[in-house]
Amino acid sequence: MANYLCLFAERLQLEYERDAQNCVVIRKPATPGHEAAEPIVLLNHMDMVCVGMKDPQNSTIEAYEENGWMKARGTSLGADNGIGLSMALAVLEDDSITHGPLEVITTTNEEDGMTGAANLSANFIRGRKVINLDSEDYDTITTGGQVPVCSCTAYR
C-alpha cells in the first residue's frame, strides 16, 4: 500500500515522504491565495483488522448483504480505515477544492500497536491541526486535543 501511495503522489506531482515504518506523508500546496493558511493534516492508516482469518495473505472475503448492510462471513470487510484513506486521496486528487497547505499522513500498524504513528519523526509532520479520518462512520469526523469537545454533527 505504501508503494501505491508513493506512485499516487508521483502521478499527481505532489511532494511525499516515506519513513522506515512505511508511513507515507503526501503534501499538497495551498490553492493560490491561501498559502498563508495554517497547514491541515488529514490522518488515516493503511492497515486493517484481519479478524478470523487464519491466512490473511491468501484468504478471500465472503461478502453478503443483510438488511441493507454489507457484511462478511467469519471476518471483517477490511474497510477500516479504507473510508478515511479514500477520502484523503479524493481531497488530494480534486483540484476544485479551495484549501490551505494539506498533508495526508497514512500510518502503518494502527490495528496492532500503533507503531507507525508512535515512531513518526517530528520532521515528518509540518501541520499542527489534525483531522483524524479513522472513524466507524463515513459522515463523522473524530477530533481530539487538550480540551475535551463533544459534538455530533453530520457532514456531507
Where are these regions (language model features)?
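Conserved hydrophobic/aromatic beta-strand scaffold that supports enzyme active sites
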Residues: 25-27, 130, 152
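TRNA-recognition modules of translation machinery and tRNA-sensing kinases, especially anticodon-binding
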Residues: 142-155
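Short acidic loop-to-helix transition motifs that present clustered carboxylates
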Residues: 21-25, 111-113, 138
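Active-site metal-coordination/substrate-binding segment of hydrolases
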Residues: 34-101, 106, 110-112, 117-128
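Short, glycine-/Ser/Thr-/acidic-enriched flexible segments
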Residues: 31, 47, 138
